Amino acid sequence: MKTQTLVVLLTVAACQFCLSQTPAQQEVLQFERDACKAFLEADVAGLERVLTPDFTLTLSNGDVETRADEINELRSGKVHYDVFENYDMLARLYGNDTAVVLGKTRVKGTADGKPFDRIVQFTDTLIKRDGRWQLAAGHVSRIEK
């Protein structure tokens, strides 16, 4: 009985959180899910739409990758994702055209033929151009399992 009560309370809390999101925040979070899908499916055209031309991603080790780096890794098959999923996301909007999203990402796949399965904490900076969101910068820090 206690387990059922806990499940109900957690479900209600999760629903309240979802309902407390503004439509703009929901739009930003949907953008994040769509970006994950583009990486998962190695959708180069999709990535070209969602990443700004000057996009940068700072990795846990301090390396910085560009939009071209990300796209070339997927196009070449150097990196393949079986899982690419964001969760525990929180969107903050600053005006009508800037957003910062915090969350965690689980990625699983292969890089240079070697398997990986990791969780990272991320911070993404999004801008709205021509009526659509784009990812301008990201930073990830690996979380130990």
Across the structure, where does each feature detected by a protein language model lie?
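A beta-strand edge to alpha-helix "cap/lid" segment located at domain peripheries
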Residues: 21-145
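Positively charged n-region of N-terminal signal peptides that target proteins for export
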Residues: 1-5
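Bacterial N-terminal signal peptides
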Residues: 7-16
